[in-house]
C-alpha cells in the first residue's frame, strides 16, 4: 500500500472529544492509521515485520499461519482487509520491538504498548470476537509477562479465554484431522489454545 492509499480517519478530532460519534466501522481505519504511521517511523514494511516475527517469536509461540498472514497482507495491499488484522499487526510490532531505554513496565510507558492496548480495548468493546483479536491478545499477554506487568497479563489472557469460548475454538480444534494440521485454520485454532494454556499457568 502506498502512502497516498492510507486509510483516512473520519472526523478523528470530533470523536475523540465526543465518543458517541465513534462508529464500529471506523475502527479498522483508525487502527490502520496507527499501523502505517509506526511502520513509517521505524522504516519498516508489513511484510518485513511479519518475516521478523516468523524468524523469532513464532519459534517459541506459534499461533499464526504464515500462509494466512501473507494472504491478509495481500488484502491490506488491495484495500480489502479485515479490520481486526490491523490490531494483530500492532501486537506483532509491540512484541518484536526493542523497548526504549527509559521504559518502565510498571507504568506502561512504552508509547507503542499504550497504542496497542488502546486499539485492542476499542475492538473488544465495539467489535465481535475474532481469531485475529485473540492472537493479538496473546501477543500482548506475552509482552506484559516479559516486561514485568503480570497483573495486566492476567486480565488480557482472561479476555482471550472468553473470546475462545465465544468462538468455540475448542470444538473446532478438537475436530481437526491430523492430516489438516499444516498451515490451515484448524492448525491456528489448536496452537492458539495451546499458547493460551501455556500463558495462563
Language-model-derived ranges and their functions:
Residues 15, 60, 193-194:
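Tryptophan-centered motif/residue detector
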Residues 13-30, 163-171:
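Short, compositionally biased low-complexity segments
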Residues 144-201:
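Acidic/serine-rich, low-complexity amphipathic helices located in mid- to C-terminal regulatory regions
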Residues 1-10:
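Intrinsically disordered, low-complexity transactivation/modulatory regions
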Residues 9, 14, 18-21, 56, ...:
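Intrinsically disordered, low-complexity regions enriched for glutamine and histidine
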Residues 26-132, 137-149, 181-184:
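C-terminal transcriptional activation/regulatory domains of eukaryotic transcription factors
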Amino acid at each position: 500500500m502506498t502512502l497516498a492509499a492510507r486509510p483516512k480517519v473520519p472526523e478523528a478530532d470530533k470523536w475523540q472529544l465526543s465518543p458517541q460519534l465513534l462508529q464500529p466501522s471506523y475502527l479498522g481505519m483508525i487502527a490502520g492509521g496507527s499501523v502505517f504511521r509506526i511502520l513509517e517511523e521505524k522504516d519498516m514494511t508489513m511484510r518485513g515485520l511479519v518475516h521478523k516475527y516468523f524468524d523469532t517469536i513464532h519459534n517459541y509461540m506459534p499461533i499464526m499461519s504464515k500462509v494466512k498472514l501473507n494472504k491478509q497482507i495481500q488484502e491490506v495491499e488491495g484495500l480489502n482487509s479485515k479490520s481486526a488484522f490491523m490490531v494483530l499487526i500492532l501486537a506483532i510490532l509491540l512484541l518484536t520491538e526493542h523497548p526504549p531505554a527509559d521504559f518502565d513496565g510498571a507504568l506502561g510507558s512504552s508509547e507503542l504498548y499504550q497504542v496497542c492496548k488502546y486499539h485492542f480495548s476499542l475492538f473488544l468493546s465495539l467489535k465481535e470476537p475474532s481469531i485475529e483479536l485473540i492472537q493479538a491478545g496473546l501477543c500482548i499477554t506475552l509482552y506484559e509477562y516479559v516486561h514485568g506487568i503480570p497483573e495486566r497479563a492476567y486480565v488480557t489472557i482472561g479476555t482471550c479465554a472468553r473470546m475462545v469460548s465465544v468462538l468455540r475454538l475448542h470444538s473446532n480444534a478438537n475436530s481437526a484431522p491430523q492430516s489438516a494440521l499444516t498451515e490451515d485454520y484448524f492448525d491456528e485454532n489448536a496452537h492458539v489454545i495451546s499458547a493460551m494454556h501455556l500463558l495462563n499457568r
